[in-house]
Curated annotation (Swiss-Prot):
GO terms for biological process: proteolysis. It comes from Sinorhizobium fredii (strain NBRC 101917 / NGR234). It comes from the Bacteria. Coiled coil: none annotated. Keywords: Plasmid. This is Uncharacterized protein y4kE.
Length: 347
């Protein structure tokens, strides 16, 4: 939660002049600058902003979530060109198809513990008829099957009411979920959840397409989803049996509305290793540009990573002992992904 807030607030819209981070590190969008940021966090406490103030946070109880959501919608209505971002990191469950998100006060009302759970898709469907803004939902929560919710007499409701009738006023929206149906979403002990870390890695300069104006590179849902998926794979331990994969993305439109705009070409993170791994002590990996300038790193301690702008690159592996194995080289490969892993087999 804090990491996402920091990404938004360390950009030029919130930081004092001269102290903002580059768009490869923080939010930037001249067409839709940051207008507001509201954080509900558990436990109750405060948030130390990047610009030096301390802000009290609100508990994400179901009542507070509803109040904050309605206020968010009212702000979005002020400008049809707005981009609305809803980020949720917490508990989630599923009835096998539909995802339900759990508020912080779940279980406190013993007469109806499920009134602190809300239905995500219906919340979004109601929202689409109340604003013209483009909407981005990033949901870092489990979709584990819950027989308890299946057996309830009444399904949990949306955060807001709405009618099925009438045309949608929002034509470009998406829900990007951390995991697939009936599965968990993981986080390291004391660390940032895998999906959130992958989302932030993607936003920090690793995906985008040239902006229609010719100035900068647009980061939209279409590019973000692919980049998040690639980083999510990188963040999970080797050999993990139940690997978390990005879930089904719901939405309408062509998913090309820029959430974020980079000032320079996106970069690829290329990870290289050698097989068999017994060669690691004498092996090294390299990456070379079109001017034949080569950057070499030893593989003695394991895989190495290079971060370079999207484009044509030559890469490969060789040995500090020329009698062990010949250089293996891949010439002028076009690299436009966010994160790429290559295991290079040598003889």
């Amino acid at each position: 939660m804090v990491a996402v807030a920091d990404w938004f607030l360390t950009g030029s819209d919130a930081m004092p002049a001269g102290q903002a981070k580059d768009p490869s590190e923080a939010f930037s969008n001249a067409d839709a600058p940051l207008g507001s940021l509201v954080m509900l966090a558990s436990p109750n406490g405060s948030y130390d902003t990047p610009f030096g103030t301390k802000v009290k946070t609100t508990r994400p109880s179901i009542a507070n979530l509803k109040t904050a959501y309605v206020a968010w919608l009212e702000r979005l209505k002020l400008n049809p060109q707005s981009r609305g971002v809803f980020y949720f990191c917490g508990h989630g469950i599923s009835d096998g198809e539909t995802q339900y998100l759990v508020a912080d006060d779940f279980g406190e009302d013993e007469a109806d513990i499920w009134n602190a759970v809300f239905q995500l898709t219906m919340t979004v469907q109601a929202t689409l008829r109340k604003s013209k803004a483009s909407l981005f939902y990033f949901i870092d929560a489990c979709m584990e099957l819950s027989e308890e919710i299946i057996n309830q007499l009444e399904d949990p409701k949306a955060l807001i009411g709405g009618s099925r009738r009438g045309a949608l006023t929002t034509t470009d929206w998406a829900i990007v979920r951390a995991t697939t149906a009936n599965r968990l979403a993981y986080a390291p002990d004391g660390g940032v959840a895998h999906f959130t870390q992958a989302l932030l890695s993607a936003l920090r300069g690793h995906c985008g397409v040239e902006h229609p104006s010719g100035n900068g590179y647009s980061v939209d849902v279409a590019r973000l989803r692919a980049a998040i998926s690639e980083f999510l794979e990188f963040l999970q331990p080797e050999g993990m049996a139940d690997r978390q994969k990005i879930g089904k993305t719901e939405g309408d439109g062509n998913w090309t509305v820029p959430l974020h705009v980079l000032s320079k070409r996106p970069s690829v993170m290329l990870e290289l290793d050698v097989l068999p791994q017994g060669f690691r002590p004498i092996a090294q990996a390299f990456m070379e540009d079109t001017a034949l300038v080569r950057d070499t790193k030893p593989l003695a301690t394991g895989p190495v990573r290079f971060v370079r702008e999207h484009g044509e690159w030559t890469y490969g592996t060789n040995s500090t002992d020329p009698t062990s194995f010949p250089e293996k080289i891949y010439n002028r490969k076009l690299l436009t992904n966010a994160a790429v892993r290559r295991l290079i087999k040598v003889d």
